[in-house]
Amino acid sequence: MPAKKRDHYYNKAKQMGYRSRASFKLQFINKKHHIIKKGDTVVDLGAAPGGWLQVAKELNGGGKVIGVDLQRIEPIEGVETIKGDMTSPETQARIFEIVDEVDTVICDAAPNLSGNWALDHARSIDLATVALDVATKLLKKGGNFVVKVFQGDLYENYVKEVGKRFSYATTYKSQASRQQSAEIYVIGKGFLTTSLRKGDVVDVTIDAMGKTGDGIAHVDDFVVFVKGGSVGDKLKIKITDVKPSFAFADIVEKEK
């Protein structure tokens, strides 16, 4: 990124009272991907110094915002902060003492850089993996997730892992990031609480009909719409798409 552009975001952050130029990155992410809505409960992992907390509070319009970090975060009006390890069950319990459920988990944390690119990339993916695991413990069904990673040979597999746990996964390079920076944001939308995944083959019995004519089956109380199914059919089906509250499937084999 040219120095002039870099200084633009740095100076703008100072003028607007943001603690970090990274505040603009979350604004750009949300403008395009709508991960935070009015009234949402947001948890920021690795939140110090608090630039993303400030923006999250603006975006969620009165919803709760909680920041977690090993470092102390200077107070922000309307924001709860927890000094603790995000992986600790005690820290996670403290979050649930404040809120019943979490709509969005965000993480702009980065590892301490060594100057060894391969090592820094691996540490970045490891940190993002920890954030993903914590997010799956906090998020409600249909919740959203965004995390920063450094691109490298482990990057694509990480994006795939996010895709397994959310109904939609994508990546975003913020215009507020330095042009030469390898940082990129991985976004997951529609957190999946079911164990079903696209491509799974399962045996079901159609027990109802949907309004559009698809058969309805239940797998561990999760609704699956089966194209061409009729009530009473015993079928082997293949999952074609999974949403937070239901899935779609095609018939592989019908029991005779």
Swiss-Prot record:
<keyword id="KW-0698">rRNA processing</keyword>
<keyword id="KW-0963">Cytoplasm</keyword>
<dbReference type="Pfam" id="PF01728">
    <property type="entry name" value="FtsJ"/>
</dbReference>
<dbReference type="InterPro" id="IPR015507">
    <property type="entry name" value="rRNA-MeTfrase_E"/>
</dbReference>
<dbReference type="InterPro" id="IPR050082">
    <property type="entry name" value="RNA_methyltr_RlmE"/>
</dbReference>
<dbReference type="Pfam" id="PF01938">
    <property type="entry name" value="TRAM"/>
</dbReference>
<feature type="binding site">
    <location>
        <position position="108"/>
    </location>
    <ligand>
        <name>S-adenosyl-L-methionine</name>
    </ligand>
</feature>
<feature type="active site" description="Proton acceptor">
    <location>
        <position position="148"/>
    </location>
</feature>
<dbReference type="InterPro" id="IPR029063">
    <property type="entry name" value="SAM-dependent_MTases_sf"/>
</dbReference>
<protein>
    <recommendedName>
        <fullName>Ribosomal RNA large subunit methyltransferase E</fullName>
        <ecNumber>2.1.1.166</ecNumber>
    </recommendedName>
</protein>
<comment type="similarity">
    <text>Belongs to the class I-like SAM-binding methyltransferase superfamily. RNA methyltransferase RlmE family.</text>
</comment>
<comment type="function">
    <text>Specifically methylates the uridine in position 2552 of 23S rRNA at the 2'-O position of the ribose in the fully assembled 50S ribosomal subunit.</text>
</comment>
<feature type="binding site">
    <location>
        <position position="52"/>
    </location>
    <ligand>
        <name>S-adenosyl-L-methionine</name>
    </ligand>
</feature>
<feature type="binding site">
    <location>
        <position position="69"/>
    </location>
    <ligand>
        <name>S-adenosyl-L-methionine</name>
    </ligand>
</feature>
<feature type="binding site">
    <location>
        <position position="50"/>
    </location>
    <ligand>
        <name>S-adenosyl-L-methionine</name>
    </ligand>
</feature>
<keyword id="KW-0489">Methyltransferase</keyword>
<dbReference type="GO" id="GO:0008650">
    <property type="term" value="F:rRNA (uridine-2'-O-)-methyltransferase activity"/>
</dbReference>
<keyword id="KW-0808">Transferase</keyword>
<dbReference type="GO" id="GO:0005737">
    <property type="term" value="C:cytoplasm"/>
</dbReference>
<dbReference type="InterPro" id="IPR002792">
    <property type="entry name" value="TRAM_dom"/>
</dbReference>
<dbReference type="InterPro" id="IPR012340">
    <property type="entry name" value="NA-bd_OB-fold"/>
</dbReference>
<feature type="domain" description="TRAM">
    <location>
        <begin position="195"/>
        <end position="253"/>
    </location>
</feature>
<dbReference type="InterPro" id="IPR002877">
    <property type="entry name" value="RNA_MeTrfase_FtsJ_dom"/>
</dbReference>
<feature type="binding site">
    <location>
        <position position="85"/>
    </location>
    <ligand>
        <name>S-adenosyl-L-methionine</name>
    </ligand>
</feature>
<keyword id="KW-0949">S-adenosyl-L-methionine</keyword>
